[in-house]
Amino acid sequence: MVPEYSRFYNILGYNFKDYTLLIRALTHRSKTKKNYERLEFLGDSVLSFVIAEVLYKQFTDLAEGKLSQLRSKLVKGTTLAQLASSLKMDEYIILGASEQGGHKREKILEDVFEAVIGAIYLDSDFATVKKVILKWYQPIISSINLDTIKFKDSKSKLQEILLQNALSLPEYSIETIDGKDHEQQFTVVAVSKDLNLRVKAQGTSRKKAEQKTAEKMIEMLSQQGLHEKK
């Protein structure tokens, strides 16, 4: 164990075998090309899967759309930044001169949180990183009360995100209708001219296909840093 990180290891609840992975996860691109961005990409996927799995198992009667919305609440930037701060990650972030003072910035905290997850995964295995993530999230997950959560359908949520960012609403159109009358499959396309996005999805009705298309577009917007503002 590297002495200066022993306290941090205790806070994280994980001891790195290869501490250089942790260093990389804490290093902002303003410092060096060997930064956390690739680990952040990996950690984002690992976190999303772990949270999706625990919600699927815990809320057995919750429909797909609501599970997706609940997951979004748990992995949104504000939540990740708060968790990063509670784990004292801000005290260990390595920044270049141009970013000094950025330790408390929400976007940097969010990115580092995901990068540390990616680093733990590479340093161990999926079972281990899952255990660590669930320990960090335990207070949040145990306090979920579905009766107090306001769920929105995906089209409404997408509309709100776009309007909050002064963007025009998408245009939905049916591309194809396949199958017999009693088992039709609708393919719907949604186009956002402002963002130059074109997304398609299928469903057993036009309404379901449009909702799935909206879900896909929300995910794409999230990757670009556009989230619903609270």
From Swiss-Prot:
InterPro entries in the cross-refs: dsRBD_dom (IPR014720), RNase_III (IPR011907), RNase_III_dom (IPR000999), RNase_III_sf (IPR036389)
Cofactor(s) the protein requires to work: Mg(2+)
Catalyses which reaction(s): Endonucleolytic cleavage to 5'-phosphomonoester
Keywords tagged on the record: Cytoplasm, Endonuclease, Hydrolase, Magnesium, Metal-binding, mRNA processing, Nuclease, RNA-binding, rRNA processing, rRNA-binding, tRNA processing
A molecular-function term among this protein's GO annotations: rRNA binding
Span of domain RNase III: 5-125
Residues annotated for Mg(2+) binding in this entry: 40, 111, 114
Record-annotated active site: 44, 114
An annotated GO cellular component: cytoplasm
GO BP term, example: regulation of gene expression
Keyword check for rRNA processing: yes
Keyword Metal-binding: yes
Chain's role: Digests double-stranded RNA. Involved in the processing of primary rRNA transcript to yield the immediate precursors to the large and small rRNAs (23S and 16S). Processes some mRNAs, and tRNAs when they are encoded in the rRNA operon. Processes pre-crRNA and tracrRNA of type II CRISPR loci if present in the organism.
Quaternary structure, from the entry: Homodimer.
Protein name: Ribonuclease 3
Recorded name of the encoding gene: rnc
